[in-house]
Amino acid sequence: MQNALQKYYDFLRIERRLSPYTLTNYRRQLSAVTELLTQNGIRSWQQVTPSVVRFILAESRKAGLHEKSLALRLSALRQFLAYLVVQEELKVNPATGISAPKQGKYLPKNIDQEQIGKLLDNRSNEPIDIRDRAMLELMYSSGLRLSELHGLDLNHVNLQSREVRVLGKGSKERILPVGHQALDAVLDWLQVRLRFNPKDNALFVSSQGGRLTPRAIQKRMEIWGVKQGLSTHLNPHKLRHSFATHMLEASADLRAVQELLGHSNLATTQIYTHLDFKHLTDVYDQAHPRAKRKG
């Protein structure tokens, strides 16, 4: 079983060019599936039937996995089994037609603009603080995913045109604008970056000189949020959602926000760009000709 998995991981890395972060997620899900199978006496992928797939989902749910995590696990397994069909290791995909439990619409909380200002109001001259502020400014300015920020190299940022080139899901490249404050923060970081003795072209490096890992970026964001007195837990997803919400509040151009976020499906953007009812009411009162009070 492990031999087939390793070939699949090589395929994802070389042929599909998935990021290390995404590849790690695939490994995590398929390792959990493999452990469940071996614990129940299944030693080959040829023994996996639709009933076995349903059993995996049921056991995963018993173990405490929520709907979104179950959907991710099923998706990873289904794609791997489809690969085995193409490789003629299986005749049919036993996960075809099986659905994960229906997910409710999850509306992530956003950070309001006042809190964003508080978050980024730090002019420390410490090199690590300069780096962390540049990461936060860039992520909020361009709505980057954690994996996209992690994968940035020096040549991905064009200082003249104020653009950043990112590799999104499915190796889709997109060019994004960078705001003036984010650009200034990146320039400040580039002036001190060499003090970290960087070992490669990664834009953001650790104190040891290597590319910052996704987990290290998350940890630095958590620490920064606490240090700046943020009233909510800070994570990359929340910052990206805040970017989307604030962009929609300012422009109401859902298609433009979809392009900036790199979503292939507009429905995904609609979930990200949830607007609170008070904002909608304010916009309505100001814009609708029959909503204004008579003077």
Swiss-Prot record:
CC annotations in GO: cytoplasm
Residues of the Tyr recombinase domain: 106-285
UniProt keyword terms in alphabetical order: Cell cycle, Cell division, Chromosome partition, Cytoplasm, DNA integration, DNA recombination, DNA-binding
Gene3D superfamilies found in the cross-reference section: 1.10.150.130, Intergrase catalytic core
UniProt GO BP: cell division; chromosome segregation; DNA transposition
Places the protein is found: Cytoplasm
UniProt main location, coarse: cytoplasm
Domain of life, per lineage: Bacteria
Record InterPro entries: CB, DNA_brk_join_enz, Integrase-like_cat_sf, Integrase_catalytic, Integrase_recombinase_N, Integrase_SAM-like_N, Recomb_XerC, Tyrosine_recombinase_XerC/XerD
GO molecular function, one term: tyrosine-based site-specific recombinase activity
Similarity-based family: Belongs to the 'phage' integrase family. XerC subfamily.
HAMAP family, A to Z: Recomb_XerC_XerD (MF_01808)
Function: Site-specific tyrosine recombinase, which acts by catalyzing the cutting and rejoining of the recombining DNA molecules. The XerC-XerD complex is essential to convert dimers of the bacterial chromosome into monomers to permit their segregation at cell division. It also contributes to the segregational stability of plasmids.
NCBIfam families in alphabetical order: PRK00283.1, recomb_XerC
Protein name: Tyrosine recombinase XerC
The species this protein was found in: Actinobacillus succinogenes (strain ATCC 55618 / DSM 22257 / CCUG 43843 / 130Z)
